[in-house]
Swiss-Prot record:
This is Oxygen-dependent coproporphyrinogen-III oxidase. Its EC number is 1.3.3.3. A divalent metal cation binds at H96, H106, H145, H175. Residues 239-274 are annotated as: Important for dimerization. It is an enzyme of class 1 (oxidoreductase). It comes from Xylella fastidiosa (strain 9a5c). The active site is at H106. The keyword Transcription regulation does not apply. Gene3D superfamilies: Coproporphyrinogen III oxidase, aerobic. Substrate binds at S92, N108, V109, R110, G257, G258, R259.
Length: 305
């Protein structure tokens, strides 16, 4: 079996595992699966769960696509690959829970290969996961980062710090001067050792289940009202802004002729913007600002709910 097929098999199995956990936790709705083909080459399967008891929308897609010309979002970073044939596979998800006390989350794990004249000229792994709470709990954030740190440990003492920092620097709404959430892990261009890098990708994918779903289970029955719902919809607007303005995966997908319905599945089903909104000082909504900047979560002394 080729290296590419090994990665592909892992990713399709990961999609299945995550979907099974989501359906079990939700207990009400099920994923609808949409198989699609891309005219330029390749295809995928997009799965969407909507209007569940726990998840307002949960979208998770697998894609295996190929082409003969890299889109600008990729070739600008790798000009030496202009004109090369390429193939990429990945799993990407964004979950928008119903309860405002359950954070939105994102995971992406991917593998990219480029060839010229029948010979591989580049191949690398990328991905990561991040968490976007609206009403954050320190306990949840510390759990999230503890799982991230522990899965990084077998890959070197600096891996967690480096990929946490990369996440903090990547998921930033520069026009708002705030991070998208409380971070996690982000990596790209991982190409030193296939077996080691593939093992890390698997650790990230597997670790996501351990990092996210205990938080969902802990918070999805928390009582909330119209005020919390309105704030959740307002903050979802920031998620839309980041994905459409800055996200590399979104730009790559759209510029490469990808399937728009699958690419934009990351966007929430309901969202609102409000001109000049400022939360009341001292409110739970105002408290969120303290979390939307890089912090050393695992070494801070203040740990509370």
């Amino acid at each position: 079996m080729s290296d590419f097929d090994r990665v592909r098999d892992y990713l399709t199995a990961l999609q299945d595992r995550i979907c099974n956990v989501v359906e079990t936790i939700d207990g009400q709705s099920h994923f609808h699966e949409d198989h699609w083909q891309r005219t330029e080459g390749g295809g995928g399967r997009t799965r969407l769960l909507r209007d569940g008891a726990v998840f307002e929308q949960a979208g998770i897609g697998f894609s295996d696509v190929c082409g003969t010309h890299l889109p600008p979002s990729a070739s600008v970073r790798r000009p030496e690959l202009a004109g090369a044939n390429w193939r990429a596979c990945g799993v990407s998800l964004v979950f928008h829970p119903k309860n405002p006390f359950v954070p939105t989350t994102h995971l992406n794990v991917r593998y990219f290969r480029a060839e010229r004249d029948g010979k591989q000229v580049a191949a690398w792994f990328g991905g990561g996961f991040d968490l976007t709470p609206f009403y954050p709990f320190d306990e949840d954030v510390v759990h999230w980062h503890t799982v991230a740190r522990d899965l990084c440990a077998p890959f070197g003492d600096e891996r967690y710090a480096a990929h946490k920092r990369w996440c903090d620097e990547y998921f930033v709404l520069r026009h708002r001067n705030e991070t998208r959430g409380v971070g996690g892990l982000f990596f790209d261009d991982l190409d030193k050792d296939f077996e080691r890098d593939f093992a890390y990708q698997r650790a990230v994918g597997d670790g996501f289940l351990d990092a996210y779903f205990p938080i969902v289970t802990r918070r999805h029955d928390t009582p909330y009202g119209d005020r919390e719902r309105a704030f959740q919809l307002y903050r979802r607007g920031r998620y839309v802004e980041f994905n459409l303005l800055f996200d590399r995966g979104t730009l790559f997908g759209l510029q490469s002729g990808g399937r728009a319905e699958s690419i934009l599945i990351s966007l929430p089903p309901l969202v609102r913007w409000e001109y000049g909104y400022h939360p009341l000082p001292g409110s739970a909504e105002a408290r969120l600002a303290d979390y939307l900047l890089p912090r050393d979560w695992l070494n801070e002394s203040r740990i509370c709910e």
